[in-house]
Amino acid sequence: MAQAQSPLQWLATTVIRGYQLFISPLMGPRCRFNPTCSHYAIEAIKLHGTAKGSWFALKRILRCHPLHPGGSDPVPPKNDRCNK
């Protein structure tokens, strides 16, 4: 069963989705990574929460520039400290 999003997660993913629908098509494909930075951000926020997911997304966006080779860069898995 899917976990419900917090209001902050909903807001963050809605803003990113708005970017995907309205701004990104005007700029064309520019992301060097797979998945794209915006998809990565949504996945990271849903998996890790708003604060940590946004931190992962920011670090990823800062790596997305012409001097970086890009490639496959999935969201890191969530560490479950209770199972260690």
Swiss-Prot record:
One of its GO terms (cellular component) is plasma membrane. It holds the Pfam family YidD. It is a peripheral membrane protein. InterPro entries: Membr_insert_effic_factor_YidD. The keyword Cell inner membrane applies. It is found in: Cell inner membrane. Keywords: Cell inner membrane, Cell membrane, Membrane. NCBIfam families: membrane protein insertion efficiency factor YidD. Belongs to the UPF0161 family. Could be involved in insertion of integral membrane proteins into the membrane. This is Putative membrane protein insertion efficiency factor.
